[in-house]
Amino acid sequence: MILAAQNSVFVHIRRGDYVGIGCQLGIDYQKKALEYMAKRVPNMELFVFCEDLKFTQNLDLGYPFIDMTTRDKEEEAYWDMLLMQSCQHGIIANSTYSWWAAYLIKNPEKIIIGPKHWLFGHENILCKEWVKIESHFEVKSKKYNA
């Protein structure tokens, strides 16, 4: 499916251990990133990776997507990494897991979008050619700038 897609884009949404401790990104980050990507990648095919099946079942990103969420993330982590790096472009979370998937994409014309704000002040973690999008962290529906 991903390999057959002409303009595949992965979106990684990290929740899991980030939820409740103030580390998960607000969904507006992914929406802004998708708006940016849609202007540059015609007919993009989105593949969403997340470890929270309940969350993705009700997710509205403003664009149609294929939900790649699996029930057992620990057993499927290597497979998700392989699938994400098989995409042509990527939108990463504030996670080194999706950072590596994006870094390993072989497309020399790849567009990678990452959050401007990372944990613990690691603001320069993105590669220089990657696009930084403004982001914030969410805690129990309250927004805090990182």
Residue ranges and their predicted role:
Residues G121-A146:
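Leloir-type glycosyltransferase catalytic cores
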Residues M1-E75:
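Core catalytic architecture of nucleotide-activated donor-dependent transferases building glycoconjugates
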